[in-house]
Swiss-Prot record:
S-S bridge residues: none
Pfam families: KdpA
Domain of life: Bacteria
Gene: kdpA
Annotated family: Belongs to the KdpA family.
Listed name of the protein: Potassium-transporting ATPase potassium-binding subunit
Topology in the lipid bilayer: Multi-pass membrane protein
Places the protein is found: Cell inner membrane
Cited NCBIfam families: kdpA
HAMAP family listed in its UniProt record: KdpA (MF_00275)
Transmembrane segments: 5-25, 63-83, 132-152, 170-190, 253-273, 283-303, 329-349, 356-376, 379-399, 416-436, 484-504, 526-546
Keyword Cell division: no
Gene Ontology cellular component list: plasma membrane
Gene Ontology terms for molecular function: P-type potassium transmembrane transporter activity; potassium ion binding
Amino acid sequence: MAAQGFLLIATFLLVLMVLARPLGSGLARLINDIPLPGTAGVERVLFSALGVSDREMNWKQYLSAILGLNMLGLAVLFFMLLGQHYLPLNPQQLPGLSWDLALNTAVSFVTNTNWQSYSGETTLSYFSQMAGLTVQNFLSAASGIAVIFALIRAFTRQSMSTLGNAWVDLLRITLWVLAPVALLIALFFIQQGALQNFQPYQAVTTIEGAQQLLPMGPVASQEAIKMLGTNGGGFFNANSSHPFENPTALTNFVQMLAIFLIPTALCFAFGEVAGDRRQGRMLLWAMSVIFVICVGVVMWAEVQGNPHLLALGADSSINMEGKESRFGVLVSSLFAVVTTAASCGAVIAMHDSFTALGGMVPMWLMQIGEVVFGGVGSGLYGMMLFVLLAVFIAGLMIGRTPEYLGKKIDVREMKLTALAILVTPTLVLMGAALAMMTDAGRSAMLNPGPHGFSEVLYAVSSAANNNGSAFAGLSANSPFWNCLLALCMFVGRFGVIIPVMAIAGSLVSKKSQPASSGTLPTHGPLFVGLLIGTVLLVGALTFIPALALGPVAEYLS
């Protein structure tokens, strides 16, 4: 079993790096404001037709464009879901959503979280899934990538005030990166057996003679961007464990690759744009070390089996509860870590049925800020915050002004870094406390004791860190939970983007200082260890008390 797990992890990472390297070169061209080959003429026509100016923006203008687009998308999606019954492509005549569920869902998809307090096949029409959710899957992913584009430019430009043009970046990211790759993935899914139609639900007779209604719909097109954009919201309630979304072992492997593809490519792009590819490799090493350790822990915990069932004499050599037999325990464990290391949230197994330790690792990966590969764009700019913090700590230890890529890190940057890092832990801990203090919060818990608290902590961690997966033993479709999680998702997304853009605006105006004998190398194993230690230290200090009340207490009981 250990050899199979090692081979699975090694194969996954090897294929991932091979695919991400050329994509990273393409992203580097876009960051450097160089059109991809053959696209310049098309861009000129599009910019002219849409009235888009390619004049560069300062950080406030860039941020305003990103926020404006997302707020407009939020309003449109909210009213679309409220009035779903008036819109076309609704063969099942599904009614509009309640105001609190519509708000929660709109915020969820605009913030790239894709938390779902509903069952897709019984709640949303084809039009809502396509024109509403799928569109936001593209736009939220493009927004995250645009923010990291601006931050990378801030490190590589000198004595400037501009960070690029948000509209140009968004168009290029959507047209030349997300749309083509998503199309290829969708076609592959269709070839493998995923659904893509507009037929009404099909009534069939089972082999037992009972009647069953099979849901239909344009699944593959949404499934592709759901994974590529690290969105995660499933067309069906069972998400990627549903055979209509994820029909074969091969599509499952491609789904995992799609989740990590752009976050990995952005690391390569960062090193290329910075003029030192070792910087990108340093980030990949730090992310990969944490990732491999976490996968190993989850696989080990799930292979050990459920100790409560073993104590009763049950034949439970491995923990297969809540897992698809066609995928097995090792693949399910790998997928769980992939989807929570990135801010995806898609699932092929029920995380609520994992062992105490097996479920704690995905929860902790979210709580440290989704920086182990992370979401498209958001993962890298989240990790860059920890890079700045690690550089600052190293500067304190050696008595030098901290600097990174030749840019001095001053008080303003560190205040903004601390603010951005503290946003999500504050939301998680305060949100979980509020839920446990109120009857409306506690009434949603379907399990008592430490596991019930773990369900609450997981839900708030998932929302605040824009992941979207869940311990499913929580009845979250209530006004209290819909509003609480919507607030966590909104602040967790934009409460980090705003200080990140402010950091970019501050750094882009600085000159790069040449490296000296006292400069801390930020590309070697020493800094990789320092960066990993910083991530682990912040995560441990912040969440160990809360984890001790949930999964740790459950494991020890």
